[in-house]
């Protein structure tokens, strides 16, 4: 009866949204404020009651926590389109990839860029070097200096007024795209896929991040040295690729660590161990862990540089309201503060299901996050924060190699299972077999 009553409230709400929240983001309208007004002490529904974590005007009133309300709304209507739980149908508004091609044949398609991410790149990653944006060289010095300031950046509503070239990136900042894959492979530039493809069937990962948006923003914001940038432009920035020169990879890791404030995994192994299947598996798993660290820092931590999200009130408000107590993935599944996160997360299958690594925020006295050793399966200590497997990511229609009964809070792997994962036969077990301390 309680379930039916609550469902009716949500159904009534969605049919006629109140005017006082018509200008709020969709995820706030449908999951935050409705439940705040219904269950946070406002018995008669006469006026909206705001939870202190919604970052909305009004007097905060003690009641259920925002995370409880979100989880409650998920239980009521898990098929709601505004909830990104990884189902292919939830990705439709954000991706032009056909459903049947989404995972098994993902490498043949280039992911769709969200309009918001396009504007982020155009507005905030303006480079003033002549070699990158030639038309900038004709500007006055004062204008050059102002290009990277939020006040002088073009409006999000008028991307045509942007100071960047008509093409997305110049040659110096052109990154790997899936259209380039056959051409690059023919030239012999990309060999990483040949090492990993046979060992990780079903894992949508060719040594490169499947979704470019986050990587482009990160790497352009790093202001990497010209030599590193040139090498990266031709390589697609594969962090774990053994064919990338060690000094370039370490430079990128160092820059990423400095920018995000999150410790990235240690240096490359000795030269004599940089070959063979053992190193390839190590490199791939290490790469995925690094990606997890970067994404966690950018989307769930408070180490984002101001100019990246300046003058975007909605994003600023939502990011400011995030409390760093839950791991990155939990927030990514529960909020829509960046559109492309819905298309990004499900494609990192190992990260999406193992949620690895998880920072221990209670021990950040020295300013560095402490990561648990996933090889010991200590992640199970955080069951309350790990989204349960819902069937969308490893659906048999999308990927027959992914275990259907997988749960992130499962018991530790047996010796046989660990051996199985070390052989690379099951993509879902790869990350947990590698320690972040390597």
UniProtKB/Swiss-Prot annotation:
<keyword id="KW-0946">Virion</keyword>
<dbReference type="GO" id="GO:0044423">
    <property type="term" value="C:virion component"/>
</dbReference>
<feature type="region of interest" description="Disordered">
    <location>
        <begin position="134"/>
        <end position="167"/>
    </location>
</feature>
<keyword id="KW-0426">Late protein</keyword>
<feature type="compositionally biased region" description="Polar residues">
    <location>
        <begin position="144"/>
        <end position="167"/>
    </location>
</feature>
<protein>
    <recommendedName>
        <fullName>Minor capsid protein p49</fullName>
    </recommendedName>
</protein>
<comment type="function">
    <text>Together with the penton and the other minor capsid proteins (M1249L, p17), forms a complicated network immediately below the outer capsid shell, stabilizing the whole capsid. Plays an essential role in the formation of infectious virus particles. Especially required for the formation of the capsid vertices. During virion assembly, associates with the membrane and probably mediates the docking of the penton complex to the inner membrane, where it recruits the capsomers to form the penton core.</text>
</comment>
<comment type="similarity">
    <text>Belongs to the asfivirus p49 structural protein family.</text>
</comment>
């Amino acid at each position: 009866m309680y379930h039916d009553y609550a469902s009716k409230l949500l159904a009534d709400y969605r049919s006629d949204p109140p005017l006082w929240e018509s200008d709020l983001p969709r995820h706030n309208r449908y999951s935050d404020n409705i439940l705040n007004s219904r269950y946070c002490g406002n018995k008669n529904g006469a006026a909206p009651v705001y939870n202190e974590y919604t970052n909305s005007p009004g007097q905060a009133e003690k009641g259920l926590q925002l995370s409880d309300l979100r989880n409650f709304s998920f239980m009521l209507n898990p098929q709601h389109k505004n909830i990104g739980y990884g189902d292919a149908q939830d990705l439709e508004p954000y991706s032009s990839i056909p459903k049947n091609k989404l995972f098994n044949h993902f490498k043949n398609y280039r992911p769709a860029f969200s309009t918001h991410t396009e504007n982020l790149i155009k507005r905030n990653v303006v480079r003033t070097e002549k070699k990158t944006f030639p038309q900038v060289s004709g500007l006055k010095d004062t204008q050059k200096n102002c290009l990277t300031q939020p006040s002088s950046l073009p409006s999000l509503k008028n991307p045509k007024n942007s100071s960047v070239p008509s093409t997305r990136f110049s040659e110096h900042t052109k990154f790997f795209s899936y259209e380039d894959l056959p051409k690059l492979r023919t030239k012999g530039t990309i060999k990483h896929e040949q090492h990993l493809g046979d060992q990780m069937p079903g894992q949508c990962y060719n040594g490169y991040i499947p979704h470019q948006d986050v990587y482009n923003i990160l790497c352009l914001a790093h202001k990497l040295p010209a030599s590193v940038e040139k090498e990266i432009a031709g390589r697609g920035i594969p962090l774990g690729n053994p064919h990338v020169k060690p000094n370039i990879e370490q430079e990128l890791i160092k820059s990423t660590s400095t920018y995000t404030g999150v410790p990235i995994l240690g240096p490359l192994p000795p030269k004599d161990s940089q070959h063979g299947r053992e190193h390839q598996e190590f490199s791939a798993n290490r790469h995925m862990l690094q990606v997890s660290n970067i994404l966690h820092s950018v989307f769930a931590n408070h180490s984002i540089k101001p100019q990246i999200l300046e003058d975007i009130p909605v994003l600023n408000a939502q990011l400011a309201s995030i409390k760093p107590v839950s791991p990155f993935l939990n927030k990514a599944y529960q909020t829509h503060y960046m559109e492309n996160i819905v298309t990004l997360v499900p494609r990192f299958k190992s990260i999406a299901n193992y949620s690895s690594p998880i920072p221990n925020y209670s021990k950040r006295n020295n300013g560095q996050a402490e990561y648990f050793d996933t090889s010991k399966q200590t992640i199970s200590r955080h069951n309350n924060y790990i989204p349960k497997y819902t069937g969308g990511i490893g659906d048999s229609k999308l990927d027959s190699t992914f275990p259907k009964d997988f749960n992130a809070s499962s018991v530790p792997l047996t010796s046989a299972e660990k051996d199985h994962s070390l052989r690379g036969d099951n993509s879902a077990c790869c990350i947990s077999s590698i320690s972040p301390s390597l």
